[in-house]
Amino acid sequence: MRLILLGAPGAGKGTQAKFICEKFGIPQISTGDMLRAAVKAGTPLGIEAKKVMDAGGLVSDDIIIGLVKDRLKQPDCEKGYLFDGFPRTIPQAEAMKEAGVAIDYVLEIDVPFDAIIERMSGRRVHVASGRTYHVKFNPPKADMVDDETGEALIQRDDDKEETVRKRLDVYSQQTRPLVDYYSNWAANGDASAKVSPPKYRKIAGLGEVDKITASVFDALK
C-alpha cells in the first residue's frame, strides 16, 4: 500500500494517516522528519540540506526527492508507505513521477473550508496538561476554564481564524492543484511516466471519525 494523502490543513489527515499506517503496517513519511534524520546522521544529502537551512534558504526539490528515494529503501517501506505533507506542489509531484516513485492510491479528504475554519478556530487548550476543548463541539463546563484545574484556557496562534484563513489560502494556491493533477493522471494515464498511474479516491471528511475511517478503508480496497 503506497499512498499520498491530500487535504487542506485541519481536514483530519493526521488522524486518518495513523489509522491507515496501523492497518497496513506501513510508515508515515514526512519530509520534515526525513530532513531532521538526514541532518542528524550527517548523510551527504543531510549535509547539503543543513547548509541551505543554516543560510535561511528553502531546501530544493532535488534534495527532497533524493531523501525520499533513500527513505524508501529502508526495510520498513517493504509493505508500502504513506506520504504526509508531500508532495506540496506540482513540480514536486512531477519530480516524484520522474524519479519513478510508485504510488498506488492518492486519497483526498475533502472538507469545506468554512467547516475547517469553524473546527480549528474553535479549539481551546489547557497548556499544562494539553487537554483540548472546542467552543461548539466539546466546550468546557465554564467558559475558557479547564474542567479539572480551573485554570485558564488559551487559543493557540495557529488556531486563530486569521492564521487558519492564511494557511487555507496557501493550500489553495500551492497544494490544491495537486487534486486536479493526480485525478487527471489517474483518469487519463501518462505514456511517458516511469510508473503506473495511481488510483484517485475522494472521501468526505465531515462526520464521526470512525465513519470517516470506514470510508477511507473502503476507498483503499
From Swiss-Prot:
The protein's name in its UniProt record: Adenylate kinase
Reaction(s) catalyzed by this protein? AMP + ATP = 2 ADP
Q: Which residues bind AMP?
A: T31, R36, G57, L58, V59, G85, F86, P87, R88, Q92, R156, R167
By its UniProt entry, which Pfam families does this protein fall under? Answer: ADK, ADK_lid
- Pathway recorded for this protein: Purine metabolism; AMP biosynthesis via salvage pathway; AMP from ADP: step 1/1
TM regions (residue ranges): none
Give the record's GO CC terms: cytoplasm
**Domain comment in the entry:** Consists of three domains, a large central CORE domain and two small peripheral domains, NMPbind and LID, which undergo movements during catalysis. The LID domain closes over the site of phosphoryl transfer upon ATP binding. Assembling and dissambling the active center during each catalytic cycle provides an effective means to prevent ATP hydrolysis.
Top EC group: transferase
UniProt xrefs under NCBIfam families: adk, PRK00279.1-1, PRK00279.1-2, PRK00279.1-3, PRK14527.1
**Membership in a protein family:** Belongs to the adenylate kinase family.
